From Swiss-Prot:
It comes from Saccharomyces cerevisiae (strain ATCC 204508 / S288c) (Baker's yeast). Acts as essential component of the peripheral membrane COG complex that is involved in intra-Golgi protein trafficking. COG is located at the cis-Golgi, and regulates tethering of retrograde intra-Golgi vesicles and possibly a number of other membrane trafficking events. Possesses ATPase activity. Belongs to the COG4 family. Keywords: Golgi apparatus, Membrane, Protein transport, Transport. One of its GO terms (cellular component) is cytosol. The gene is COG4. Present with 1620 molecules/cell in log phase SD medium. This is Conserved oligomeric Golgi complex subunit 4.
Amino acid sequence: MEGQKSNASWESSIIEGQLSKNLARYTLLLDKLSTLSQIDKLSEVIANDYAKQSKQLNAFVQQSQSSLNKESRKLELQRTNLTTTLTQFHETVATISSSNARAKAIHDDIETVDQERALVNKTLQFVKDVRTLKNNISLAHSALETKDYLVAATAINEIRSLPDKKLIVSEFAKKVVPSSEIPEEPAILIKNWCKELTSLFQEQFMEATRTQDIKELTLMFKMFPMIGQDVLGLDLYSKYVCDIIADESRKIMSNSMENSTKFQGFFSQVLLHLFKIVSTIINDHSKVIATCYGKKHMVHVMEKVEKEADLQASLILDIFMETRKIERTIHDINEWEHSQKNEDVNIDSNQSDIETDGETEKSSIISIHDLALLIMEFSQILQNWSMYSRFYSVKWNEFSDLHPHVLQPPPPIADGKFALKLKQDKVFDEFQVFVLNHLQRSFRNSISLEELPSLNDLITAVPLNDHDNISYPVTSVLDDLILLVRKNLISVVNTGQFKLLASFLNELVKFFQNRFLVKFMQNKFKLLQSKLASNVSLKRYIPKGEEQSATSRSVSPPANKFSPLSRFTFRGAAASALTNIQSNLQAVVAEDEDSILALHHYLIYLNTLYLSKVYVHRLLSIEILEDDSQRILRDNFPFDNDAAQLQNLIINSEKLVLEQTDKLSKWAVKYLFQNILQNRVRNLLGTVFVNSASSNSSTSNQKNVSRDYSAGSNQKNYITSIEDFEDLSQINSFNSKWNQLIIPYKNILHNEAYAELLSVIVDYIVTTLEQRIWTLEFNELGVTKLDRELSLFIGNMCGLNYNLREKFLKLTQIVLLLGLDDDNFDLTTGDIKDDFNGTFDWVINSQERIKARNMKIDRTQ
């Protein structure tokens, strides 16, 4: 153990370079030797070190040799083990090689057996097929002799259905199948039989079509694919159903043609019946075709059927155009429209002439009633085509195994003769001409028959809260117009034609903008504005005849025939003067009554504008786009992305109409305020929020107060004491007079119209009061009184309408600022302190806040 430690220490000393260090030390000592004794000592140290190092080296060599011997023995032992393992490995490899050879031999044997089995099965199947061939030939031969064609066709079909198509021409079949009774080769025999049966089936099919023997016809039709004549069977069947379509169409037309001009809707029903026949054929006969021929062959029949349907539909359309004299009607309408454009009539100066233009039409033009019936029949024709196109497209995709994300019309529909005819003959354009002409002429008639309701029952200071959209007073023209637009819109939507509805929406926007808003509504407003007196007030209208019947006798001329100069007296002169005064008063009264009636009509037309927006939204958005009505577009416009595009068009059209209506309605409301209500509101405001406490002492002093808001005359209103702090008579009087002024308008006007009018009034009031409040002076009690008055003022005027209350924000902040304590203000700047400034979103700036504080006369300086 000690030897191992010494060896380890010696080895570590070698690794650490101890010998080199000792040598360097000896060299250094050698240089410093000066005496003999030092040399002896150095020699002794070197000898000791040498002996020590030699001993350690011997021990290290011995230890290393021993360790090396141990490792060598271990390696020898491992080599022995590896040799044994290698021997076993070679034995295993030899065993695997032997097994592999044996497995390959077995696999080869199995493959050989499988091949032999496959050959045996193939031979067996071949023999079975030959036997089937021979049996079916024998069966077909016997069936042909007994004229059992179904059995014969079934046997031939089984022969044709054999998996090996070359079996019938094989040498084995040629030798085995023929017999003494049937010596022909199978291939030649089957070919001759198919040819013979083809001719026979065709003759019997044609005979069955002539005799209408449906059972025989169906049997023959089923047997064509059995003998390999699929195309012939489909062609014959297609011709048969096309003949049915043509015969039915001619039968209907010939039976009812003599009464067609009297029977409106006749042609649409004929076309509907035609499409029903085609749809029934496609639905019912598709089962037979799919069973006997395969579903994919139904497309072939549908193509043939559609050609015949297009032909008959085009014929019906031609007869319709000729019988209803479409071309002549279009010509008359164009002439009428041209004559209307050439008439230079000023609607502003002579509204009645325009209103009766619709009645002074040429006698040759179609009547509005007949035009409406024609549009209905025309719409039904296009609707029938649209519904049939959708049905045909769905069935086409079903039989073609197509599953498109968006339904598209197949080529027989999109490129068919009838669709091409609708485009080339400009049928859509003609239909739109009818619709627009009906809309324009009917609107003219509704103007000529206009009725306006009476407002007398609504003119009261008592609020009426039972209004709905139906009960608002409007002109009868609006109701007629909405009914007309709805009727024509339904006719256009029912056609299912994207082009028609898109074009009609554009024309409808133009019609609303030009005919309704400008030529009718705007001209009505301008005509009434010329009749409105600035001092007119909203009160009940009493016709002149009822009011003056009692006084008409007193102002009638005398019955005598004497000259006025022959008997002049003071009494006669006084009577004459009285008569003249009464006549002048009556003229003034008549003028006032006309102005009152004009104001009534103005409010009715204002309601008409706002109700028209409600009706247009209901007509376009609610009835067509919202809730369950969304199916209207999807059902009538199923192709491509038509429904989504039309939805956007409808939304944009409504937006355009509402924008134009908003402009006109705001203009009308603004005129109503500026010319009728502004002076009255100004007079009412003259008594409130003013310096003079006696401003409401007399009525004659109100105008002067409203013009002079300075604080020069009597500054006591908001410099109050305990005695007059509770005096709110001014604001209560204003609220009472305000209610008397505004409630009749609220009872009459539509909510949105009233809200717009009130918004305009509030804007004016806010502007006036914001200018007036800077002229006031306050003490502490006066500020509190102002706060109470302003709260009552705003509450009575705005109610729960917070949008209107927001307009008074600047005034309320001024009052709030006046009520703040002096501690909240910075004495240096005069403005509120910074820590308090951040608690409010101020709409008044710093200068205004300083100015507002200076209005208090009892503040701390």
